[in-house]
From Swiss-Prot:
Name listed for the protein in its UniProt record: Glutamyl-tRNA(Gln) amidotransferase subunit B, mitochondrial
UniProt similarity note: Belongs to the GatB/GatE family. GatB subfamily.
Species annotation: Schizosaccharomyces pombe (strain 972 / ATCC 24843) (Fission yeast)
Other remarks on this protein: This protein may be expected to contain an N-terminal transit peptide but none has been predicted.
Alphabetized PROSITE patterns for the sequence: GATB
PANTHER family referenced in this protein's UniProt entry, alphabetically: GLUTAMYL-TRNA GLN AMIDOTRANSFERASE SUBUNIT B MITOCHONDRIAL AND PROKARYOTIC PET112-RELATED (PTHR11659), GLUTAMYL-TRNA(GLN) AMIDOTRANSFERASE SUBUNIT B, MITOCHONDRIAL (PTHR11659:SF0)
Assembly behavior: Subunit of the heterotrimeric GatCAB amidotransferase (AdT) complex, composed of A, B and C subunits.
Keyword annotations: ATP-binding, Ligase, Mitochondrion, Nucleotide-binding, Protein biosynthesis
Keyword Mitochondrion: yes
Length: 526
């Protein structure tokens, strides 16, 4: 079989639950953890006579989201009805924005430094404010389903990209970046595991018609450009074949794996000369395959009509500017700040600190605490500030993750960690001893001053040279064979003896001081 040259084009539709206190058009509270059907107002279940009242907090969050994603904000907030019949939609229509979305023509920047993919901008076609549906689950009786209306009416922000993706690395980087932006903006938790962020994927393939740079592209055996590698200069493509929408993808891993399978499925059919329908498909994360759900619907099928119960709301320039002023610094700005100037931390450390909003705020609080101490000389401060990112991103996050996969690093308050780092810089605590002490503090948190805890748990640095000397001599005598090898010139054993002595002293002595004692013992024996 002779294969053509194919490339995939991928577009995303993301639904974000906004972190409002109340629902979009009713006074019911938003609480994903509440017992089923306990956060429901009359309008949420479309009881006759109930009317929608727009939640101003949801509108503000939507405008904030549009600004955070570099969109042009609409001059008016106007809603439409999207009609379709499904049990989780009691009114028979969803209130959304078809004619005038809240934001258009935005973009999310991706960079090699922060996002670990080639520098690019992902165009946002539009974002719209709409209501979520009820949550349906299967009942024991297969002819029935269970409906929880707690979710019905929760404000959603739908974000639609152009079909500009050609590889899964950029797709996953985009999704993680979007999560980071909306979390720092304070408008959504964007947790995919509980439905707070849901992703649909549009996948199509097209023939490669340009002959430039083909040698630089990685074609798989079936003739398609691999979706595994990011490509800076993508070739010109012909007419797209039938587009398939992949629905209900619950995490980034499923998004990536569903794209891989669907691209290969479409290419296999195309190579055999078989066409396929434009349809909606699901993804089975056990088999790793997509499966048909229903035929693809068009806009006409939904019979969009204006929502006459909610009058248009003018979004004045002063209102939009006031929302813009409330927007905090976002990841790209913070990455630039962290990796330059007085901070100048590594890209890897900055990426970790910005991967979770709480990590960044933890770092900022610890940094300001160290920087504000007046009785510490400047060189010690600079040393502590230089090593602080390591202690947070590697030692603290790493050790807390051993206990909890979704770590709460505030189990050790930032001021306590700052004091530990300062003591290491002052050489009142060795790095090895500090790591052991930090582990004990994570397991048994305490509000006592760090200096008191170190004394109580006997973690302070051993400055007594006689004690270090005695411990070194004890270690050397226990391992006389290796000491003989050392005396005969096997100098690599010096580090080995230092490690053994460090273990005996619980890391409380400086490796440099221990090595000096080992060298002294070696000279005496010679």
């Amino acid at each position: 079989m002779s294969f053509g040259r194919w490339a995939a084009s991928i577009g995303l539709e993301i639904h974000l639950q906004l972190a409002t206190v109340k629902k979009l058009f009713s006074p019911a509270k938003v609480n994903p953890l509440a017992q089923p059907n306990t956060c429901v107002a009359y309008f949420d279940v479309s009881l006759p006579g109930s009317m929608p009242i727009l939640n101003p907090e949801a509108l503000k969050f939507a405008v904030k989201g549009a600004l955070a994603l570099n969109c042009e904000v609409a001059n008016v907030c106007k809603f439409d009805r999207k009609h379709y019949f499904y049990p989780d939609l009691p009114a028979g229509y969803q209130i959304t924005q078809k004619e005038i979305p809240i934001g258009r023509n935005g973009f999310i920047p991706l960079s090699a430094g922060l996002d670990n993919v080639p520098d690019t901008q992902i165009p946002i076609q539009h974002i719209q404010l709409e209501q979520d549906t009820a949550k349906s689950t299967s009942a024991k009786n297969p002819s029935r389903i269970l409906l929880d209306y707690n979710r019905a009416g929760t404000p959603l922000l739908e974000i639609v990209t152009k079909p500009c993706f050609h590889d899964v690395n950029t797709v996953s980087a985009f999704l993680f970046k979007l999560q980071s932006i909306v979390r720092f903006a304070g408008i959504s938790e964007a947790l995919m595991e509980n439905g707070g962020m849901r992703c649909d994927v549009n996948v199509s393939i097209a023939p490669v018609i340009s002959s430039e740079n083909l040698n630089e592209l990685h074609f798989k055996n079936n003739g398609v450009i691999s979706v595994e590698k990011s490509i800076s200069h993508f070739p010109q493509l012909g007419t797209q074949l039938a587009r398939v929408e992949l629905k209900n993808l619950s995490n980034v891993r499923n998004v990536v794996n569903s794209i891989r399978h669907e691209v290969d499925r479409q290419v296999s059919l195309a190579n055999m000369g078989v066409s396929w329908p434009s349809e909606t498909r699901g993804f089975d994360d056990i088999t790793g395959k997509t499966f048909p759900l229903r035929n693809k619907t068009t806009s006409d099928d939904y019979l969009f009509l204006p929502e006459t119960d909610i009058p248009p709301i003018i979004l004045s320039r002063s209102y939009v500017n006031s929302v813009l002023k409330s927007l905090p610094a976002l990841p790209d700005e913070l990455f630039q700040k962290l990796t330059t100037g007085s901070h100048a931390i590594s890209h890897k450390e900055a990426r970790t600190l910005l991967s979770v909003k709480e990590y960044y705020h933890y770092y900022r609080n610890a940094y300001h605490h160290i920087d504000s101490i007046s009785h510490v000389n400047q060189s010690l401060k600079e040393d502590a500030l230089r090593t602080l990112p390591y202690w947070i991103t590697v030692e603290l996050v790493g050790k807390v993750r051993e206990i909890d996969p979704s770590p709460n690093i505030n189990i050790v308050p930032p001021l306590q960690l700052a004091d530990i780092v300062l003591l290491v810089s002052k050489k009142k605590l060795t790095a090895a001893s500090a790591k052991l002490f930090l582990r004990s503090l994570i397991k048994s948190p305490s509000s006592k001053p760090i200096s008191t805890l170190i004394q109580e748990k006997n973690f302070g640095t051993i400055g007594d040279s006689e004690k270090i000397k005695a411990c070194v001599e004890s270690v050397l005598s226990k391992h006389s064979k290796q000491f003989e090898e050392l005396k005969n010139g096997k100098t690599s054993l010096i580090k080995w003896f230092v490690g053994l002595t460090m273990r005996e002293l619980r890391g409380q002595a400086s490796p440099k001081d221990i090595e000096m004692e080992v060298q002294s013992s070696l000279r005496r024996e010679k």
